[in-house]
């Protein structure tokens, strides 16, 4: 409880007083309830009530003070850090990684200084990640490195990965690119060097004794080395809810630590001797595997459990967790926002709090085979259930069958672990014994892959929830608390009515699970919404009609890698969009379709792709159409004058709003060699809102459309043609549209000079308010207003 109070203090500083003080008041209320409802200890608790409340208040404000100290320390030097600033950094390497063709060295206990004579005073700073082309040092080395500052970027689109928040939560303030290690001191680092060599040798041995896919998974699971982890397997495990097995956590620490601890105890070693032997071993394993936050939590809890045995006491899981949470947050209060830490803590809370109330209250020896199986199932539910809101908060989707998959996966983990460890150790000596020893792990991992691929084919395997509003978290965890209280009451009243108790328990479990799942998956009704995504040099536009029909326009980029996987899909999932009814493609340039190709390959549901009739002969478009058909997506061809109607039905079952998309260009007789001259152009109408979307058409085509449609082009919103190029957005075109708002989608730095000053001046002269994705990030139109900086 004290750990929760301490956490509340940090939450108040990190996320706002409303959340932090609300959590604090909840903690105090729980303390009062415990003091006046726990019969066995009511008198003792009442006498200590004042002490509990006083300590809670002290911890709450101590946490706030600690957060402020750390935050002020960070601000004191980050205000002087700018991108590409030349600096010198001194620090100790705590972890090394090889990723995307370069080495990353994580430095702690850092000091830094500018390389210019005017700012070369040395000052303390937070942790730093150094990017190098070659492995110039090892873990444990104290180094001096020169380089240029790389500030981590914040997310500029809803759902996009926020690098700044991610690194900040781990205490890393900036990166050092083009880094060069000038000097290093290694005389006391022999221990770290030995562990790194052991890790590297074991990882290389796994590559020698088995295939690359299996070696990548085993290296991640056993050694914390994700350099060779197959992205397809990583995504597959995530979608099916078993990605936790890839991280070094309590499960892995338990397998290693408990195995040695029990072996020593069986051989007659005392509690103290076992503790003194296993503790250095488990600490060394933690350092070797990268010492992630979840690993620190697991190692700390395991050591506390062994220490309790040394003093003749029984270790308490929740108290150990609380102690480690306070230790971790004291060291780095920003860890409160780290996903791995949150998952780790919530999983243990599920085991320690929810599981005892989810399983039957029957002695193990009195349980039937069916009851044992039932308890295993509900134990899995109890662990997974509290984690679902956290999963939805981070991935905007939940794996429906995760409970069943984990029931089959977790019991086989020791087989993988033991087989992998022995195979990697033997492989360091000779390949043949390693190849034999790795076979059990190989076959179990193949079973995992087969199981996961089967599960994702089942209906509803992956439910897109969207970003959860605060009220859903409140309702979900309040519902879970009510369930625990209800079962507690049932257990008190069961006495001799065991049969009646079991029936009520089954009903309560099912009702609770169904209710909590409904809280997560039921989506509120939506209103019309337009989003122009920040995809760098490219286009990506989402629109939701009042009727609920959801469409997407283009989707590509030439400067942002994997724009479909990293920006478009996360945005759609963040907004709870399970499928796109119509995906419009203006033309087949890469900055308009690269992301769409990725979305198709991901298996995301698209009902129709809409292209211009005249685009059939375009080679790149033909390739896209072929890919669409491969994934079962229907392709619609439009020409000038064609209309796609969406109906909006009011409460009286009457169609009361015009919702349509009218194709303006090209017609069947139009033909130009340049793709830009043949862009699919259309007008979108949704009740009192309208918009013009014309891809990359030049001013000549704009003039042609003005002469054909005249005042029919008038619209509220205009997506600037060709990213605001010099030869688009002509004066006559803008006068015909007369837009209130104009969005320009382009990269901050591009070789085309977008947006051109001439185009910007013409748009401003037309009286339109301009929004730039390169400055504002994602641009959102909702409830008759435009919003910037959706971050």
Regions picked out by a protein language model, each given a short descriptive name:
Residues 37, 231-402, 465-525, 703, ...:
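Hydrophobic alpha-helical transmembrane segments in multi-pass membrane proteins
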Residues 4, 169-301, 306, 385, ...:
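Aromatic-rich juxtamembrane segments at the membrane interface
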């Amino acid at each position: 409880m004290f750990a929760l109070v301490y956490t509340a203090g940090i939450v108040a500083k990190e996320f706002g007083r409303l959340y932090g003080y609300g959590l604090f008041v909840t903690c105090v209320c729980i303390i009062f309830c415990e003091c006046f409802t726990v019969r066995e200890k009511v008198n003792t608790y009442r006498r200590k009530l004042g002490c509990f409340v006083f300590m809670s208040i002290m911890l709450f404000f101590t946490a706030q003070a600690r957060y402020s100290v750390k935050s002020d320390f960070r601000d004191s030097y980050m205000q002087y850090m700018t991108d590409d600033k030349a600096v010198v950094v001194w620090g100790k390497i705590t972890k090394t990684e090889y990723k995307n063709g370069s080495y990353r060295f994580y430095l702690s206990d850092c000091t830094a200084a500018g390389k210019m004579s005017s700012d070369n005073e040395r000052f303390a700073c937070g942790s730093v990640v150094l990017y190098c082309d070659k492995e110039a040092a090892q873990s444990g080395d104290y180094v001096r490195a020169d380089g240029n500052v790389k500030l981590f970027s914040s997310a500029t689109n809803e759902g996009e990965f926020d690098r700044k928040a991610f690194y900040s939560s781990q205490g890393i303030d900036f990166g050092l690119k083009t880094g060069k290690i000038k000097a290093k001191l290694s005389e006391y680092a022999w221990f770290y060097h030995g562990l790194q060599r052991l890790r590297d040798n074991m990882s290389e041995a796994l590559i020698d004794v088995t295939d690359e896919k299996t070696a990548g998974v085993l290296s991640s699971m056993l050694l914390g080395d994700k350099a060779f982890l197959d992205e397809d397997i990583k995504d597959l495990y995530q979608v099916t809810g078993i990605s936790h097995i890839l991280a070094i956590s309590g499960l892995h620490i338990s397998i290693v630590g408990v195995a040695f601890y029990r072996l020593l105890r069986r051989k007659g070693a005392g509690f103290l001797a076992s503790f003194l032997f296993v503790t250095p071993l488990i600490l060394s394993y933690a350092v070797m595997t990268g010492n992630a936050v979840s690993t620190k939590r697991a190692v700390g809890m395991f050591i506390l459990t062994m220490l309790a045995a040394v003093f003749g006491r029984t270790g308490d899981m929740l108290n150990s967790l609380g102690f480690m949470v306070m230790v971790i947050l004291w060291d780095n209060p920003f860890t409160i926002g780290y996903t791995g830490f949150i998952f780790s803590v919530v999983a243990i809370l599920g085991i320690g709090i929810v599981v005892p109330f989810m399983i039957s209250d029957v002695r193990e020896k009195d349980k039937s085979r069916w009851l044992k199986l039932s308890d295993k199932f509900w134990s899995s539910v109890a662990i997974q259930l509290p984690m679902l809101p956290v999963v939805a908060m981070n991935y905007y989707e939940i794996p429906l069958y995760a409970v069943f998959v984990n029931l089959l996966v977790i019991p086989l983990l020791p087989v993988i672990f033991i087989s992998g460890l022995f195979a990697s150790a033997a492989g360091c000596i000779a390949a043949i014994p390693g190849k034999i020893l790795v076979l059990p792990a190989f076959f179990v991992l193949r079973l995992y892959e087969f199981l996961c691929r089967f599960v994702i084919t089942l209906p509803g395997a992956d439910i897109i929830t969207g970003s959860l509003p605060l009220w859903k978290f409140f309702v979900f965890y309040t519902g879970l608390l009510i369930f625990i209280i209800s079962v507690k009451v049932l257990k008190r009243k069961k006495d001799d009515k065991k049969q009646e108790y079991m029936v009520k328990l089954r009903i309560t479990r099912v009702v609770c699970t169904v209710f909590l799942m409904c809280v997560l998956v039921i989506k509120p009704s939506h209103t019309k919404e337009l989003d122009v995504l920040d995809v760098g040099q490219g286009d990506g536009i989402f629109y939701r009609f009042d009727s609920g029909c959801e469409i997407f326009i283009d989707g590509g980029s030439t400067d942002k890698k994997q724009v479909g996987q990293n920006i478009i899909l996360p945005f759609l999932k963040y907004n709870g969009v399970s499928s796109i009814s119509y995906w419009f493609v203006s033309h087949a340039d890469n900055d308009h379709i690269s992301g769409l190709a990725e979305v198709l390959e991901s298996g995301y549901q698209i009902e129709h792709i809409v292209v211009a009739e005249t685009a059939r002969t375009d080679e790149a478009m033909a390739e896209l159409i072929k890919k669409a058909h491969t994934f079962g997506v229907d392709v619609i061809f439009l020409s000038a004058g064609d209309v796609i109607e969406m109906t909006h039905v009011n409460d009286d079952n009457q169609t009361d709003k015009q919702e349509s998309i009218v194709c303006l260009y090209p017609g069947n007789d139009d033909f130009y060699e340049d793709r830009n001259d043949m862009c699919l152009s259309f007008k979108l109408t949704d009740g009192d809102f309208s918009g013009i979307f014309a891809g990359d058409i030049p001013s000549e085509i704009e003039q042609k459309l003005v002469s054909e449609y005249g005042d029919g082009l008038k619209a509220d919103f205009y997506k600037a043609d060709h990213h605001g190029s010099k030869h688009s957005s002509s004066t006559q075109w803008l006068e015909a549209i007369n837009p209130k708002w104009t969005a320009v989608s382009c990269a901050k730095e591009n070789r085309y000079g977008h947006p051109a000053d001439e185009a910007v001046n013409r748009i401003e002269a037309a009286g339109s308010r301009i929004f730039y994705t390169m400055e504002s990030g994602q641009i959102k139109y909702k409830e008759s207003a435009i919003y910037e900086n959706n971050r």
